[in-house]
A protein has these predicted regions:
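Residue-level signal for inorganic ion chemistry
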Residues: 21, 49-51, 77, 110, ...
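Solvent-exposed alpha-helices and their adjacent loops that cap or buttress functional pockets
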Residues: 42, 139-140, 146-149, 166-172, ...
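ATP-binding N-lobe of GHMP and related small-molecule kinases
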Residues: 2-105, 123-132, 168-171, 180-183
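Contiguous, small/hydrophobic- and glycine-enriched helical/loop subdomains that border
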Residues: 114, 118-155
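Gly/Ser/Thr-rich beta-alpha loop segments that engage phosphate groups in nucleotides
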Residues: 24, 34, 77, 108-112, ...
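Glycine/serine-rich anion-binding loops at beta->alpha junctions
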Residues: 96-125, 143, 246-258
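Conserved, helical-rich catalytic subdomain that frames metal- and/or nucleotide-binding sites
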Residues: 59, 150, 154-247, 260-275, ...
Length: 282
């Protein structure tokens, strides 16, 4: 899918989602945040953002496809616009955000929306920002926002903002099943339930191994505490393995569970009629 699409005065962008392949909570920081290590992997599940220039100041936003609890003016898309407006003289815009990426899913939907808004404003108004500058602004909005400025498979450190490209062999011909039960995970509680520790082997090294080894070595540190409070998530992970997944995990702090399969697992689509489910080719 193209990153930008122009029709007349409107520009459309397609923010993509991500999954976490491995996630280790390494240490608690003095500022209250946590250092972690993970691999961000982009997946082709997209939101859609339409942007047109407006004669009115600010960012007027309509959100479709999801009932988000926050004030629309607190949405990360609007906050991204406000950050760019602080540094560049840009006009007001009218935005329609169509949510396809599930919310509170550990798939980075809101972060991706913010990053793609920054990229869209740069394109729309010919600002000429470098990727590093856009990543700087994106990082002010969320720990994983910077990843979406150039969403390629990346090893992330720090709070998720220190990025380096990573090569993962063998995923290109695989299928990804995404299952999100109708439950939400408190990120604060997920962190509270985990004692930070340095892993014996870095997830960057594990993902360089054959995928068949991941199940025994690659872990998401949030799973233990989250699965205790929301057992359905652990049950879905176990079920994906029973249906033939090579590797299954929770993404981020949840609540999406994903499985990687050799063949398209069509039975997964029918196994969870009440949950968000999707199967895509990696």
């Amino acid at each position: 899918m193209v990153e930008f699409n122009r029709v007349g005065q409107m520009i459309t962008v397609y923010p993509k989602a991500k999954i976490n392949i491995g996630l280790n909570v390494v240490s608690k920081r003095d500022d209250g945040y946590h250092n972690l290590e993970t691999v961000f992997y982009p997946v082709n599940v997209h939101d859609v953002i339409d942007i047109t220039e407006s004669h009115q100041a600010g960012c007027d936003i309509d959100i479709e496809g999801a009932n988000l609890a926050c004030d629309p003016q607190q949405n990360l898309v609007v906050r991204a616009y406000n950050i760019i407006r602080e540094h560049y003289d840009i006009p007001g815009v009218k935005v329609t955000l169509n949510k396809m990426i599930p919310s509170q899913a550990g798939m980075g939907g809101g972060s991706s929306d913010a990053a793609y808004m920054i990229k869209a404003l740069d394109e729309m108004f010919s600002i000429g920002m470098s990727d590093d500058e856009m990543r700087l602004y994106a990082s002010k909005l969320g720990a994983d926002c910077a990843f979406f400025i150039n969403p390629v498979p990346s090893y992330a450190e720090g709070i998720g903002d220190k990025l380096s490209p990573v090569s993962i062999n063998g995923l290109d011909d695989k299928f990804l099943a995404l299952v999100k039960p109708g439950v939400a995970v408190s990120t604060k509680e997920a962190y509270a339930g985990r004692t930070p520790s340095t892993p014996k082997k870095c997830c960057k090294d594990i993902v360089a191994q054959p995928i068949e080894t991941w199940a025994n070595e690659l872990r998401n540190d949030f799973e233990d505490s989250v699965f205790r409070s929301l057992p359905i998530l652990g049950e879905v992970k176990k079920d994906l393995y029973n249906r033939g997944a090579i590797y299954a995990s929770m993404s981020g702090s949840g609540s999406t569970i994903y499985g990687i399969f050799e063949e398209r697992p069509l039975d997964v689509l029918y196994a969870y009629p009440d949950y968000y489910t999707m199967i895509i080719k990696l």
